[in-house]
Protein backbone atom coordinates (compact mmCIF):
# COMPACT_ATOMS: atom_id res chain seq x y z
CA UNK A 1 0.00 0.00 0.00
CA UNK A 2 2.86 2.36 0.76
CA UNK A 3 4.24 1.86 -2.77
CA UNK A 4 1.09 3.44 -4.17
CA UNK A 5 0.89 6.23 -1.59
CA UNK A 6 -1.81 4.78 0.67
CA UNK A 7 -1.82 4.09 4.40
CA UNK A 8 -2.02 0.51 5.63
CA UNK A 9 -5.01 1.39 7.84
CA UNK A 10 -7.17 1.71 4.72
CA UNK A 11 -7.60 -2.07 4.72
CA UNK A 12 -10.24 -1.58 7.42
CA UNK A 13 -12.45 0.65 5.25
CA UNK A 14 -15.38 -0.35 3.08
CA UNK A 15 -15.19 -0.02 -0.69
CA UNK A 16 -17.71 2.84 -0.82
CA UNK A 17 -15.48 4.90 1.48
CA UNK A 18 -12.70 5.24 -1.11
CA UNK A 19 -12.32 8.05 -3.61
CA UNK A 20 -11.77 7.31 -7.30
CA UNK A 21 -8.07 8.01 -6.98
CA UNK A 22 -7.75 5.72 -3.97
CA UNK A 23 -9.60 2.97 -5.82
CA UNK A 24 -7.25 3.31 -8.76
CA UNK A 25 -4.19 3.12 -6.50
CA UNK A 26 -5.63 0.06 -4.75
CA UNK A 27 -6.10 -1.61 -8.15
CA UNK A 28 -2.48 -0.82 -9.00
CA UNK A 29 -1.31 -2.19 -5.63
CA UNK A 30 -3.26 -5.41 -6.23
CA UNK A 31 -1.56 -5.77 -9.60
CA UNK A 32 2.00 -5.33 -8.37
CA UNK A 33 1.59 -7.89 -5.57
CA UNK A 34 2.22 -10.56 -8.21
CA UNK A 35 5.57 -8.97 -9.20
CA UNK A 36 4.73 -8.59 -12.89
CA UNK A 37 7.23 -7.39 -15.46
CA UNK A 38 4.48 -6.29 -17.86
CA UNK A 39 1.19 -4.54 -17.09
CA UNK A 40 -1.68 -3.53 -19.34
CA UNK A 41 -3.13 -0.22 -18.18
CA UNK A 42 -6.44 0.48 -19.91
CA UNK A 43 -7.49 4.10 -19.29
CA UNK A 44 -5.90 4.17 -15.81
CA UNK A 45 -6.57 7.89 -15.37
CA UNK A 46 -9.97 8.30 -17.01
CA UNK A 47 -12.77 9.70 -14.84
CA UNK A 48 -10.21 11.19 -12.43
CA UNK A 49 -9.67 14.90 -11.78
CA UNK A 50 -6.49 16.27 -13.37
CA UNK A 51 -4.76 16.63 -9.98
CA UNK A 52 -5.55 13.00 -9.12
CA UNK A 53 -4.44 11.93 -12.61
CA UNK A 54 -1.06 13.51 -11.93
CA UNK A 55 -0.79 11.61 -8.63
CA UNK A 56 -1.65 8.30 -10.31
CA UNK A 57 0.86 8.97 -13.12
CA UNK A 58 3.54 9.73 -10.51
CA UNK A 59 2.75 6.45 -8.73
CA UNK A 60 2.97 4.53 -12.02
CA UNK A 61 6.31 6.15 -12.91
CA UNK A 62 7.80 5.38 -9.47
CA UNK A 63 6.63 1.78 -9.65
CA UNK A 64 8.02 1.45 -13.16
CA UNK A 65 11.43 2.59 -11.95
CA UNK A 66 11.37 0.57 -8.73
CA UNK A 67 10.16 -2.72 -10.23
CA UNK A 68 11.47 -2.30 -13.80
CA UNK A 69 7.95 -2.58 -15.21
CA UNK A 70 6.92 -2.36 -18.83
CA UNK A 71 3.49 -0.86 -19.46
CA UNK A 72 1.09 -1.17 -22.35
CA UNK A 73 -0.70 2.11 -21.74
CA UNK A 74 -4.07 2.49 -23.45
CA UNK A 75 -5.61 5.96 -23.37
CA UNK A 76 -7.36 8.62 -25.36
CA UNK A 77 -5.78 11.38 -23.24
CA UNK A 78 -2.83 12.63 -25.27
CA UNK A 79 -1.38 14.66 -22.38
CA UNK A 80 -1.19 11.54 -20.25
CA UNK A 81 0.23 9.52 -23.15
CA UNK A 82 2.92 12.10 -23.78
CA UNK A 83 3.97 12.11 -20.12
CA UNK A 84 4.01 8.29 -19.78
CA UNK A 85 5.06 6.72 -23.06
CA UNK A 86 8.37 6.19 -24.82
CA UNK A 87 6.74 4.53 -27.85
CA UNK A 88 3.30 5.30 -29.28
CA UNK A 89 0.96 3.23 -31.41
CA UNK A 90 -1.91 5.21 -32.98
CA UNK A 91 -5.00 3.25 -33.93
CA UNK A 92 -8.03 4.15 -36.00
CA UNK A 93 -11.04 1.88 -36.45
CA UNK A 94 -9.14 -1.02 -34.90
CA UNK A 95 -6.13 -0.69 -37.20
CA UNK A 96 -2.63 0.50 -36.48
CA UNK A 97 -2.03 3.67 -38.49
CA UNK A 98 1.23 4.98 -37.01
CA UNK A 99 3.85 4.07 -34.46
CA UNK A 100 7.19 5.37 -33.32
CA UNK A 101 9.04 7.15 -30.56
CA UNK A 102 6.69 9.41 -28.63
CA UNK A 103 8.57 12.62 -29.39
CA UNK A 104 8.71 11.81 -33.10
CA UNK A 105 5.01 10.99 -33.35
CA UNK A 106 3.99 14.11 -31.42
CA UNK A 107 6.41 16.47 -33.18
CA UNK A 108 6.33 15.03 -36.70
CA UNK A 109 3.33 12.76 -37.31
CA UNK A 110 3.52 11.02 -40.68
CA UNK A 111 -0.06 9.87 -41.14
CA UNK A 112 -2.98 12.17 -41.89
CA UNK A 113 -5.12 10.59 -39.17
CA UNK A 114 -2.44 11.25 -36.52
CA UNK A 115 -2.02 14.83 -37.73
CA UNK A 116 -5.78 15.44 -37.42
CA UNK A 117 -5.88 13.77 -34.01
CA UNK A 118 -3.08 15.95 -32.67
CA UNK A 119 -4.59 19.13 -34.15
CA UNK A 120 -7.96 18.32 -32.59
CA UNK A 121 -6.36 17.61 -29.21
CA UNK A 122 -4.39 20.86 -29.37
CA UNK A 123 -7.51 22.82 -30.29
CA UNK A 124 -9.50 21.17 -27.49
CA UNK A 125 -6.81 21.77 -24.85
CA UNK A 126 -6.49 25.46 -25.76
CA UNK A 127 -10.23 26.06 -25.16
Task: Give the predicted meaning of each segment.
Residues 1-9, 118-119:
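Conserved ABC ATPase "signature" region
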Residues 14-18, 22:
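Conserved ABC ATPase signature
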Residues 28, 56:
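Hydrophobic anchor residue at the start of the ABC signature
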Residues 33-37:
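A short, proline-enriched helix->beta-strand linker immediately N-terminal to the Walker B motif
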Residues 81-83:
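A short, surface-exposed alpha-helical micro-motif characterized by mixed small hydrophobic
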Residues 87, 99:
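Short, glycine/charged-rich "phosphate-handling" switch motifs in NTP-dependent
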Amino acid sequence: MKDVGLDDNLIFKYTHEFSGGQRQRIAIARSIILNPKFMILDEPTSALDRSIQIQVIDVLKRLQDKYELTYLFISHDLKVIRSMCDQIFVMSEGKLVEYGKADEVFENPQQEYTQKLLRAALKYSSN
